[in-house]
UniProtKB/Swiss-Prot annotation:
Interacts with CHEK1 and CUL1. Part of a SCF (SKP1-cullin-F-box) protein ligase complex. Interacts with VCP. Present in liver and kidney (at protein level). Widely expressed. This is F-box only protein 6. Disulfide bonds: none annotated. It is found in: Cytoplasm. Residues 1-48 form the F-box domain.
Length: 295
């Protein structure tokens, strides 16, 4: 009787290509040294990426690490819940609820235009006083372990869509912050408020930003947006928002930096805090990565 390890290595690799990554990494890699070495072979992860459509042969973009590329692609999705108002205001924290409060309406809405993606059916709309809502994304809870984020620091792509009513002016604002485990702000994107004049074309506009080469230690992402109308009309005449997204890209930092020393006093979401209060990074990279890979 032939033992499985007596099979040619190319046959074993072919078998591994068809095994789901969580089982491959959590279980198969621990069987023996031969399996561990084969599972770490670059060609295995390149072929798995091709097989699952993460990469095509005619794609010219270079890949630094095929194993990490595959893992990031398998995790990739919108980390914001209920981005298109399909569940009313569920999953959103209401930070400001001025005027007649937040409301959900169906596209295109009064004095509005259709959305570029016809799969999007609804939007959130603000009123005559400030309306703000937010979500705090816990990266560890979403499958992005500390070792993955700190060692490779994949790009974080943030997008939002906003539109005014044609008959009323309004202002829109967006704030995105990358924070540590104890909510120290490590990087932020907060562009100046956008003002739309009355009698505009009411077209939907995309606001986007990519965080690259940010400091290690990112554990949370705060996403907050909203606004109000500029004419103080009763009802819902402020900016409309929908299809918001936070996506962790497969693109990673080329030269991960050493651990960063925080300044004496640092910005914390909602307050200020001494650097000595922050937690230290823990964990062995590969063990943590294998154990935390999403099913």
């Amino acid at each position: 009787m032939v033992h499985i390890n007596e099979l040619p290595e190319n046959i074993l690799l072919e078998l591994f290509i068809h095994i789901p990554a969580p089982q491959l990494l959590r279980n198969c890699r621990l069987v023996c040294r031969l399996w561990r070495d084969l599972i770490d072979v670059v060609s295995l992860w390149k072929r798995k990426s091709l097989r699952e459509g993460f990469f095509t042969k005619d794609r010219c973009e270079p890949v630094e690490d095929w194993k990490v590329f595959y893992i990031l692609c398998s995790l990739q999705r919108n980390l914001l819940r209920n981005p298109c108002a399909e569940e009313n205001l569920s999953s959103w924290r209401i930070d400001s609820n001025g005027g007649d409060r937040w409301k959900v309406e169906t596209l295109p809405g009064s004095c509005g235009t259709s959305f570029p993606d016809n799969k999007v059916k609804k939007y959130f709309v603000t009123s005559f006083e400030m309306c703000l809502k937010s979500q705090m994304v816990d990266l560890k809870a979403e499958g992005y372990c500390e070792e993955l984020m700190d060692t490779f620091r994949p790009d974080i792509v943030v997008k939002d869509w906003v539109a005014p009513r044609a008959d009323c002016g309004c202002t829109y604002q967006l704030r995105v912050q990358l924070a540590s485990a104890d909510y120290i702000v490590l990087a932020s994107f907060e562009p100046p408020p956008v003002t739309f004049q009355q009698w505009n074309d009411a077209k939907w506009q995309e606001i986007s930003h990519t965080f690259s080469d940010y400091p290690p230690g990112v554990r949370h992402i705060l996403f907050q947006h909203g606004g109000q109308d500029t004419q103080f009309w009763k009802g819902w005449y402020g900016p409309r928002v929908t299809n918001s997204s936070i996506i962790i890209s497969h693109r990673t930092a080329k030269n991960p930096p050493p651990a960063r020393t925080l300044p004496e006093e640092t910005v914390v979401i909602g307050r200020r805090r001494r650097a000595s209060d922050s937690n230290t990074h823990e964990g062995f990279f590969w063990q943590g990565l294998w154990q935390r890979l999403r099913r």
